[in-house]
Amino acid sequence: MVLTPPSKALWAAELPRAAWTVATWWRHRPALAAAPRGDGRTVMIVPGLFNTDRSTAVMRGYLNRIGYRTSGWGLGRNRGVRTVGVEAERLIARVESLAAAGPVTLIGVSLGGIMARLVAHRRPDLVRAVITVSSPYAGSPKATNVWRAFEWLTGERLDDPAVVLRSDAIAGPLPVPSTAIWSRSDGLVNGLICHDAAGHAVEVRSGHLGVQLKPEVLIAVAKTLAG
């Protein structure tokens, strides 16, 4: 089956949906507070394309409050391989620095989830588990409305044989536990390429922009971490 990018209607709804999430966030405080408590493990959150640690501040703050030790990725703005290196070597070094007391759980938003999976494939000894949030790792990257922006921002061509080979490796079964949080109403990436048959998947109702702020997503992350 050939998968296509989300519809123009879903794409056009992205900003209004993100604004609605922010405007109504307070309504969900009781449900957020009732989520399972954490076990103190170290969690690193990797931001999406062209985003920084500021974009994951709400998620990190929430997970800190319920009992986890969270960290941003500390690499500035995410511009793909221009930021982390072709084999994510700079991100691996950051994870290694946090893993002195034991493997780290990686949560990646969109492109950040693809990077988290690459780290887990290359250095499974450093990674306890991977949670991806709206990360299009499991199918054609052209089943998105942002693939041209990806090529421009990262300097990579999606049809480059080396990029295709790396993408195929990232999509392969992980050597650590994994969960993919995805939405079929995502307006930027086709939700069907954000999860696969080999791993655990959790479907939510969300757009793509600001997905890491969505209370339903935060609760899904908390429940996944609690296992």
Roles of regions detected by a PLM:
Residues 25, 35, 52, 78, ...:
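Surface-exposed loop/turn and secondary-structure junction residues enriched for glycine/proline
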Residues 1-44, 50-52, 56-61, 66, ...:
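Flexible, membrane-associating and regulatory peripheral segments of lipid-active enzymes
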Residues 42-47, 52-54, 58, 64-77, ...:
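Serine-dependent carboxylesterase/thioesterase catalytic core
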Residues 174-227:
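C-terminal catalytic-base region of ester-bond hydrolases, centering on the histidine
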Residues 2-24, 144, 151-154, 171-176, ...:
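Alpha/beta hydrolase fold serine-hydrolase catalytic domain that processes acyl esters and thioesters
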